[in-house]
From Swiss-Prot:
It is found in: Cell inner membrane. GO terms for cellular component: plasma membrane. PANTHER family: BLR6921 PROTEIN, MAJOR FACILITATOR SUPERFAMILY MULTIDRUG TRANSPORTER MFSC. Belongs to the major facilitator superfamily. TCR/Tet family. HAMAP family: MFS_MdtD. This is Putative multidrug resistance protein MdtD.
Amino acid sequence: MTELPDNTRWQLWIVAFGFFMQSLDTTIVNTALPSMAKSLGESPLHMHMVVVSYVLTVAVMLPASGWLADKIGVRNIFFAAIVLFTLGSLFCALSGTLNQLVLARVLQGVGGAMMVPVGRLTVMKIVPRAQYMAAMTFVTLPGQIGPLLGPALGGVLVEYASWHWIFLINIPVGIVGAMATFMLMPNYTIETRRFDLPGFLLLAIGMAVLTLALDGSKSMGISPWTLAGLAAGGAAAILLYLFHAKKSSGALFSLRLFRTPTFSLGLLGSFAGRIGSGMLPFMTPVFLQIGLGFSPFHAGLMMIPMVLGSMGMKRIVVQIVNRFGYRRVLVATTLGLALVSLLFMSVALLGWYYLLPLVLLLQGMVNSARFSSMNTLTLKDLPDTLASSGNSLLSMIMQLSMSIGVTIAGMLLGMFGQQHIGIDSSATHHVFMYTWLCMAVIIALPAIIFARVPNDTQQNMVISRRKRSL
């Protein structure tokens, strides 16, 4: 890193800044949801669409981001991503209704979807390949700090200012980032093949309509027959994409990916697994504030052990997988995450609050080992010619499954909490207890898929740093 020219180091700082903005916004909102609900006159049990709208938009837009960067230029697209993200933040802060806030989050999601993948592409173009890993480690470090800082910062802003400030703080930072991008970042472009617009539209419509059908009756009052029609339309769009991909050589995602058994199994397991684990970052701060009466700041602080556990486990997960194998690790962590979720609910409802940080630390560790194992299992056997496409599809599936998970969590809360419930009341405790029990079952189910993972054929390489001799 020290051998790089000054202008290249500045460009890496810009990319790192984008990673930080996107990762911070992913976690800072969850802590503020109950306060948003009170301000907007909504039930806190129906605020999940604020999260779903952002994550689903990221999932829909991810496949287009890389092509746009190659065609229009990394500087232009990264600049546009920061501008859209900043404008979305402004509109979020100005929102007076839940529907306005959801639409503003969609605009934010368009910017967020382009920021991270285009940032990775930028690093690949501006640094020598030998220094790529060191550069990516540098730019992704702020992205790891964002989830650690987000919940606590969100709690402070909500408790001592208002929820609007979790979006307003993005505006001056976004303006500086956009100006730096425009002035310092080169606009690399390359020849691109024709974009698969029909395939993109089919996937986008299928994902959006199926998610809407899953939650439409609770959040929008859509009739059952209309929901059935939406579900059928979404499924038809996905099936039409499969037919299109089979016939087209330039499809967005080639069906040749699924000839690799571990990719097919890993992708299915990742989709099912992240539906369950995607509920936890949304449900935990809502449960702490609405179910137990914690302040926003206290609830935000309680999320920090979970992030610390996740970051700490990443250092040893490769050794664990090499020792026990993918199948055992994935089955054990999947069932373990379900049990830890039940333990968290039990400890909280029993009033043993001093144990909550320890339980959340354990939850973060188990979840991190599971995530890392799912990701590497999915991609490890793909040929080089399909690795980029497979990684893009996995990224899209990760975001889609998280949005479905939050949608299901909101649906469960709405189903068990039909009438208005008070903070830290007996009725509220029952609503969250039934919801967490259902979540534990959903989290545990992917163990059936992971039990079919074949035996490992080779071990993963452990990257270690040699100590310099004195």
